[in-house]
């Protein structure tokens, strides 16, 4: 009789394990929209999210692509690149003005790679680090590859 429950118990244990991985460590998610082109195409690519680093946004750095809750609607998520970290001074919109902002503690500046088709920190300001949900670490489909940080620190003397 005890052997009869082995398989259902194993199935429940595996399901619980997979759920924990999906909820707290890694998740595959489809992207949409043109804001991250050419890094991510608008046709719906699948990316691998590292949720552990997302929960600890301080481990993220300038150039990382992250998924964040949208500041104006926390139920919606956006995929953007970190352009500035707390204390950094950046141009609000380098395409149209010389206005600068110093990013406050606990916030980051997010922007899409396709600046002409992106609603980002230029529209809603610095984003609280607590809204960062995950770091994009790889494109899964199509053309799988690890995401690399395309921004390098500039040493200004």
From Swiss-Prot:
Annotated active site: 35, 80
Catalytic EC class: hydrolase
Cited Pfam families: Peptidase_S26
GO biological process, any: signal peptide processing
UniProtKB keywords: Hydrolase, Membrane, Mitochondrion, Mitochondrion inner membrane, Protease
Cited InterPro entries: LexA/Signal_pep-like_sf (IPR036286), Mito_IMP1_subunit (IPR052064), Pept_S26A_signal_pept_1 (IPR000223), Pept_S26A_signal_pept_1_Lys-AS (IPR019757), Peptidase_S26 (IPR019533)
Domain of life from the UniProt record: Eukaryota
Subcellular location: Mitochondrion inner membrane
GO MF terms, alphabetically ordered: metalloendopeptidase activity; serine-type endopeptidase activity
EC number: 3.4.21.-
The keyword Mitochondrion appears for this protein: yes
GO cellular-component term (any): mitochondrial inner membrane peptidase complex
CDD domains per UniProt: S26_SPase_I (cd06530)
Main location: mitochondrion
Keyword Membrane: yes
Xref: SUPFAM superfamilies: LexA/Signal peptidase
Signal sequence, renumbered to the chain: none
Subunit structure: Heterodimer of 2 subunits, imp1 and imp2.
Family under the similarity heading: Belongs to the peptidase S26 family. IMP1 subfamily.
Function, as annotated: Catalyzes the removal of transit peptides required for the targeting of proteins from the mitochondrial matrix, across the inner membrane, into the inter-membrane space.
Name of this chain's protein: Mitochondrial inner membrane protease subunit 1
Organism: Schizosaccharomyces pombe (strain 972 / ATCC 24843) (Fission yeast)
């Amino acid at each position: 009789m005890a052997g009869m429950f082995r398989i259902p118990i194993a199935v429940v244990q595996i399901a619980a394990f997979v759920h924990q991985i999906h909820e707290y460590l890694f998740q595959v998610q489809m992207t949409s929209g043109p804001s991250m082109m050419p890094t991510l195409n608008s046709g719906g690519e699948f990316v691998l999210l590292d949720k552990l680093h997302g929960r600890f946004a301080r481990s993220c750095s300038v150039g990382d692509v992250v998924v964040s809750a949208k500041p104006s609607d926390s139920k919606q998520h956006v995929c953007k690149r970190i352009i500035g970290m707390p204390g950094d001074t950046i141009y609000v919109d380098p395409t149209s003005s010389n206005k600068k902002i110093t990013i406050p503690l606990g916030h980051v500046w997010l922007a899409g790679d396709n600046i002409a088709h992106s609603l980002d920190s230029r529209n809603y300001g610095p984003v609280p680090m607590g809204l960062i949900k995950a770091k994009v670490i790889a494109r899964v489909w199509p053309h799988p590859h690890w995401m690399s940080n395309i921004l390098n620190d500039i040493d200004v003397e």
